[in-house]
Amino acid sequence: MAAVKKRKTAGRKGAGAKTTTAASAHADEVARRNAAQDDVVVAQIRDAATEVHRDILKKAKPDLAFPVRSLKNVTYSANRGYFEMGRAKKVRTLTVNTVKSFAQTLRMMGLSKELVETNDFATKRDAYYQSKNWEAAKFDEQTESDAVMDDIEAMFSTRGTSREQLRFIPDEHGGAVAGRLVVLDPDRDTGVVERIDCTRFGSGAYSIPSTVEHLSFETDAKFVLAIETGGIFQRLQSHKFWQTANCILVSLAGVPTRATRRFIRKLSDECNLPVYAFVDCDPYGISNIYRTLKVGSGNAAHLSQFFCVPQARYLGVTPQDIIDYQLPTHPLLDVDIKRGKDALKNDPFFQVHKPWRKAIEQLLSMGVRAEQQALAKWGLNYVIDEYLPAKLRNPQAFLP
């Protein structure tokens, strides 16, 4: 989905104001594309069900094939810049022993088709409770329905369809957003587009919704700054760092949710914006938070084409920053050391990038970790006045 052309937004309307004619026309185009995508999704579900029906008529055992979701079945594509699922499959064949799980899978696919056709959605929890009307096919625990939904998502991802397009949405919302961005959000019933100005939330911020496919953007920002901790995000927001740096701030709140990752990806793709990550300097911040944002994860590599942000670069905090800025540190815990060694030994992303191998090896040899807030040693606003401006003068030096 294309964004409204990147342009100056001086004099734009505040949150809640009605859209311009141009924005309304763009929203109509987005709606048309979404409707066309819905038709594709329904056709894909029908095709999968038709194959099962055809096998039954031939008196053959029908089966459904799903990608194996693990790091062992993942490769890193340097060309695309994200994890890709390998060829390993698990097959669910209809037998006496699998009849319940097979039926549950088909019922979940049927629920997805109904949601698409009625322009509705369901969370994982909703889907679990919906199954209570499925008689013998009902789920006893939500973990069972979650696993079936994840398998269906992985299966349809090979056809270019995401879980959100299947109309299953996360239970959690995304992170917070502040700065030089107007979000165009069409009402699902009336089509009237609301212009949400992310500079006008006072000391607060815009909250990313659970699904973001219908959104489009206007911005004149130069980059997106993705921030791990709420404390640093709040400091940058309250001092309007986005104004002086001409940027958009996004709070990751730890490992970013699907909605947050998709929002950043759409924003980067549609507005041609670089994304800089600012997280704690520890193996968790590097190999869980940043790596998941940039290339995805082993268990969810089937999502990477939709949710990762290949354009992301790592601003800091780096192991070298700990030395250069004489930051207060904490000793690495055993779990940190294990996570760092696992990244070097088993993670395809870090194995491909020599600068990252060097940085992780440096961190392990130092035996310490440092938080973003450690910069407050030099003053509460040192991160705003000195650290970030110095870093942003040389983005070419950021880790890949």
Spell out what each predicted region is.
Residues D280:
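Active-site glycine-centered loops adjacent to acidic/histidine catalytic or metal-binding residues
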